[in-house]
Swiss-Prot record:
Mitochondrial intermembrane topological domain residue ranges: 36-56
Organism taxonomic ancestry: Eukaryota, Metazoa, Chordata, Craniata, Vertebrata
Keyword list, A-Z: Electron transport, Membrane, Mitochondrion, Mitochondrion inner membrane, Respiratory chain, Transmembrane, Transmembrane helix, Transport
Localization annotation: Mitochondrion inner membrane
Encoding gene (name): UQCR11
Identification of the protein by name: Cytochrome b-c1 complex subunit 10
Organism: Homo sapiens (Human)
Coiled coil location: none
Length: 56
């Protein structure tokens, strides 16, 4: 839908910048997990969720 409004030059620029945007998005997500309570976020990941169960 967005490509309908963009010209061919900008379509090519967007295609070139998509991997960079994904990389920075991944870095931002890892930074968010690092800066916040990592356990709160990683409790939603299925494999890691079972690793840190407390035996009460």
């Amino acid at each position: 839908m967005v490509t309908r409004f963009l010209g061919p030059r900008y379509r090519e620029l967007v295609k070139n910048w998509v991997p960079t945007a994904y990389t920075w998005g991944a870095v931002g997500a890892v930074g968010l997990v690092w800066a916040t309570d990592w356990r709160l976020i990683l409790d939603w990941v299925p494999y890691i969720n079972g690793k840190f169960k407390k035996d009460n």
